[in-house]
Amino acid sequence: MKYLLHIGANKTGTSSIQTMLAANAPALAKAGWVYPDFHRRHAAHHDLALAIKGHPGAGLPEGWRGRLARLTAAPDRRFVFSSEVLFRLVPPAKVARFFPPGQTRVVLYLRDHLGYMLSWYAQAVQGRNVTCSFEDYVQIFHQPLAQYLAGWEEVYGRDSLVLRSFSRAALAGGDVRRDFIGLIEGCDAADFDLSAAESNPSISGNLLFFKKALNAYMTAAEARTDPIPDEFGRLAALKDSFRGRFAATKAEVDLVRRTFAADRTALMRRGLRFEPMPEAVAGHASPDPDTLTEDMRLIKHVALETQMTFLTHAARWQDWHSL
């Protein structure tokens, strides 16, 4: 195979894999592989994925197709590309024009639906202007993963698609980075420096509640603007309750169970194994009324001390001024 194409999915350790690949060019080269620095953003090929889709905001300069063709023409090199944008947002037939079937092995990690939706919701609140509840988010963004998987299998064939379960028990050494290295022909995990991998924790608790409230005062473009999402990643380091899993009630878990029952069955038939869903999810309350005022004041204090960008938008919120 000339290409190893890692397509996600999101919330399956993709940032850790991409950071590891970007930091280990010598280990990859030892086995004849390259992780190209071709318009990488946050160590990933997101802009390339959007350009393949034809997204007007991809931002790649004119002539990128020719440069990509010249880059990958080297007969003595094989190439790893990675972007979770590919799995759900880019038609596989378009991807195949650049990474042809027969020359490409596609790698996809999927996680259980409950963990996926909890993590995706927290990420959406952090990085966009989402204001809806978790329950509403589950119903609005009900996207059967098996449906997308079928599209990739139709273009590349089942034998060329490596489907992996994102669970500690299923991963080599309980680590998605080591698991992925094992899929790169000729590579040995012992040659890789894994110290620089990114953890990318989800925001939680009252920080999640605050960002969701703040989102009502930002446009979609404003909420996505750098460095606002990263600012909330830094705020998550202030308290344990600002990061990790947020609590989900029995009703919320039951909603996820019902909503994705057919998809879960289809993926299990495809060979994935999922643990039974719990009755409820223990985690940080969002909001936590007992510490809400204290936490809001902490967020405001740190934001002012470090002159965070989101302060411009928080100024539109009357309650912010009274803290």
Label every PLM stretch briefly.
Residues 1-323:
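Anion-recognition interface
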